[in-house]
């Protein structure tokens, strides 16, 4: 059973990366490292720190600043350059894969340009993946209009090439498309798991929202991917309960 927890649980708390890894090493074998805030693995000394633990890692690219869907070419290219920086860190900590947000488009008028930019970025990312030898995955996004890849759109899926998907169950529930994503399970290499009440992206403990995981637990079990719990700091006290609930689902 490949079960892990993201360090995002400790974002904006008084915990540093060492504190987070100490807590998680007692509970799981897989941990998702981030590149933001107090847990930024790219900060001085944190790469060596991560290397010192007996853990297997995935790596989440920065949540902010990057936009692979920007039709402003300089911004798109700088975003790709930063992905290269993240991949260098991934190699150093022996990360299995990296997770990348697809970008955003604020104005509907610009959507087609943004989609074309994203497709161009997917092509570039295939070349970058081949260069670094680390699997790149694109995460499906929650139900806010500005985000790209909220649904398994044909134009995006057909242009993934050798890239894979990180299926975020909570995001998919908000978009009412869990089944649609599970139909392309061969494209899924990684799974983010958390709960919500169907209104916004709460990142709750499994069982504390409205997602009926039993409806698709057979499909989850069949997918050869790390099931990565991704909670927010308001759910720190629920960590052990969430791990137990996920184990029960995957049993």
UniProtKB/Swiss-Prot annotation:
InterPro entries: IolE/XylAMocC-like, Xyl_isomerase-like_sf, Xyl_isomerase-like_TIM-brl
Gene3D superfamilies per the UniProt record, alphabetical: Divalent-metal-dependent TIM barrel enzymes (3.20.20.150)
Superkingdom of source: Archaea
One Pfam family it belongs to: AP_endonuc_2
Family: To M.jannaschii MJ1311.
Entry protein name: Uncharacterized protein MJ1614
Lineage: Archaea, Methanobacteriati, Methanobacteriota, Methanomada group, Methanococci
């Amino acid at each position: 059973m490949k079960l892990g927890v993201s360090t995002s649980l400790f974002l904006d708390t008084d915990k540093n990366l060492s504190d987070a890894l100490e807590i998680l090493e007692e509970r799981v074998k897989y941990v998702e490292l981030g590149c933001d805030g107090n847990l930024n693995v790219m900060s001085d000394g944190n790469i060596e720190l991560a290397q010192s633990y007996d853990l297997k890692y995935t790596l989440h690219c920065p949540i902010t600043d990057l936009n692979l869907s920007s039709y402003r070419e300089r911004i798109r290219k700088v975003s790709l350059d930063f992905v290269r920086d993240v991949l260098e860190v991934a190699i150093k900590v022996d990360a299995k894969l990296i997770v990348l947000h697809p970008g955003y488009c604020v104005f509907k008028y610009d959507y087609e340009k943004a989609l074309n930019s994203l497709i161009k970025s997917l092509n570039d990312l295939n070349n970058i993946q081949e260069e670094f030898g680390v699997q790149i995955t694109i995460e499906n996004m929650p139900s806010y209009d500005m985000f790209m890849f909220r649904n398994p759109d044909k134009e995006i899926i057909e242009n993934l090439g050798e890239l894979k998907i990180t299926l975020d169950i909570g995001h998919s529930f908000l978009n009412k498309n869990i089944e649609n994503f599970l139909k392309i399970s061969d494209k899924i290499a990684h799974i983010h798991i958390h709960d919500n009440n169907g209104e916004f992206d709460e990142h709750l403990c499994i069982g504390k929202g409205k997602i009926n995981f039993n409806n698709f637990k057979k499909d989850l079990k069949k997918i050869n991917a790390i099931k990565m719990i991704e909670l927010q700091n308001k759910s720190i006290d629920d960590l052990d309960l969430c791990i137990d609930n996920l184990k029960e689902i995957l049993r």
